[in-house]
Amino acid sequence: MQVSTDGLIIMEKSISESDKLVTILTRKFGIIRAFAKGVKSVKNKNFSSVQLFCYSDFIIFKGRSKYIINESNCKKSFWNLRCDIEKLALAQYFCDLILNLVAEEQRHTEDILRLILNSLHYLAENKISNKLLKSVFEMRILALSGYMPNLVSCSCCEESENKSFYFIPEINGIVCDDCVKNYSFAKFKLTSSVLYALRYTIYSEFNRMFAFDLKQQSQAELSAITEAYLLRCVEKNLKTLDFYKQLVVN
């Protein structure tokens, strides 16, 4: 059976001198793995459209146990990400998060596809700082994947106003000054600007998701919180994250 869809290539693997196995986040079928035959040759008609980070239209043969790409047409390559190793590493980290949070052939992934495409665009075009972009992506993909934290009111007493708050990754939410003593888990004191930013990353309209800024210190605080929450949710160390952080430090 032949099917068509658009999608972003989030991983590629060489399987012979001429063929690749690519992992695609598609609009219609979620994550699929498809064979791309002969595409390692520059003469192949699909060569330019099955590279890592390519957003393409695909015509795919769907068999009982495998997909094979028949035709593809690149809509956006994000090629300039390869010119900056820090941006390249961050883009690979974003793709790794998708692979860890989205099941193969999971349906209704349109918003996740939109998120990664918007994020790669902002990353490639230097629209916002890498640190802030990373935090927005982490919180939004967690929310879309079922890890929506409580950022509205205290997770203990439900107080929502006139309080100082802490974020506790282990309980998936915030607690107030009065209740924080009840928890021995690692916690992050929230300034008003960081709490606003956390809420914005989750609750803002999709087309306004990146339309805010923070001072450098607040960006650092937000980054520490979103990364800690992400690692708590995925419950594993991510080599792509470790590599990105090494680049940022150095």
Name the predicted role of every residue range.
Residues M1-N250:
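Non-catalytic alpha-helical scaffolds and adjoining flexible linkers that form interface surfaces
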